[in-house]
Design a protein with these regions (language model features):
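A compositional/biophysical signature of low hydrophobicity enriched in polar/charged and small residues
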Residues: 1-349
């Protein structure tokens, strides 16, 4: 459970945290230069942020370049006949144990997960187990778990847990532009590169020296390989801020299906008009999209939702209202928290 403990940050602390989230590969000197701070100030603040878990460093593997065909979002509405904790104990063993799932969150009457997969067969198996398990527990009423498939070749992921626009708004700092996160550029790895790749994904904070000792190769080789992975975007580092310390209380999940007679122009990226600063995840195909946003309070959520609905209706992009679910971050439980290691090892095996 995410007990919200809001912490007021100083002006310097806001700049450093924003700098870390926006530039997770940057060193203290680079952040200091960007914001006009002393390097020693940045170093001291970063050290405290690490010790007090203000953020978590995550290495996101670009598995679309190594054989993964799709990202899949699955969401479910539950009949809350058993307590959330008991449901999670059951699903952790039977469903969340699947290598494909890297993020999963649940509340009493709903939940969703996000996966990478080599093919649809793997996802189909997970969903069959999910439906069977929930059905036996009498957790499902009329609706089956709903899956939204994003094949990398025909999808665009504009934001993938990108907290930069959100922090820009919260801290009143100028924001940078978005980038498409999962461009497909097929690549091959040597046996040694695969070992280093998996180690970085599993332990993003581990220094090259320790990776080298663990794998039995030289520190120089590890450093060279890691630099290559980061420069050619085989791995993208993300810094995920601590929701609790930012006072974020509401997570909103949107599934929007577009009117097939008048969808937004996919090639011209018209759908980006829906983006606001609170949206941290935004994936789309030609006729549907998934968005996830975070808010401090109900007013912020309501205003952001109203803007999205106004835009959808104004453009006549929808024939019926989207599916929108809100999660209280005081009550919700993150079941799987950005664990990319199992699916990385499975894809690269």
């Amino acid at each position: 459970m995410l007990l919200i403990i809001y912490v007021n940050l100083t002006s310097y602390e806001k700049k450093v945290l924003y700098g870390i989230i926006r530039h997770p590969n940057a060193n203290d000197r680079e952040i200091a230069e960007e914001f006009g701070l002393k390097q020693s100030t940045v170093a001291a603040i970063r050290k405290r942020f690490r010790e007090e878990e203000y953020y978590n460093l995550v290495a996101v593997p670009m598995l679309q370049n190594f054989g993964a065909e799709m990202m899949v979002v699955i969401y479910t509405n539950f009949n809350p006949v058993i307590p959330l904790e008991k449901r999670i104990r059951i699903t952790e063993e039977k469903i969340e144990a699947s290598e494909e799932i890297f993020f999963s969150i649940g509340e009493e009457d709903k939940g969703f997960s996000i996966s990478f997969s080599k093919d649809y067969t793997s996802i189909g198996k997970i969903n069959d187990i999910r439906t069977k398990t929930f059905g036996q527990l009498k957790l499902l009423e009329k609706e089956y778990p709903k899956e939204v498939v994003f094949p990398f070749e025909i999808s665009k992921i504009y934001r993938f847990f990108n907290f930069v626009p959100l922090l820009s708004k919260l801290f009143n700092i100028k924001n940078g532009r978005d980038e498409v996160f999962f461009e497909v550029k097929k690549k091959n790895l040597s046996k040694k590169e695969k070992l280093v790749f998996c180690e970085i994904v599993e332990n993003p904070d581990l220094p090259c020296k320790e990776i080298a000792e663990k794998l039995g190769i030289t520190r120089h080789t590890v450093g060279k390989i890691k630099k290559k992975f980061l420069s050619n975007n085989s791995i993208k580092m993300l810094a995920i801020p601590n929701f609790k310390k930012l006072g974020l209380n509401i997570l909103t999940f949107y599934h929007i299906s577009f009117d097939p007679h008048n969808p937004p122009d996919f090639e011209k990226d018209e759908i980006k008009e829906l983006l606001n600063n609170e949206i941290i995840f935004f994936a789309t195909r030609r006729f549907e999209c998934i968005a996830i946003s975070l808010h401090k309070n109900y007013e912020s959520y309501k205003m952001a939702k109203m803007e999205i609905m106004q835009k959808l209706k104004e453009k006549r992009w929808i024939a019926h209202n989207p599916m929108i679910r809100t999660y209280s971050l005081n009550k919700a439980i993150i079941i799987k928290n950005f664990n990319f290691s199992p699916i990385t090892k499975k894809i690269l095996a």
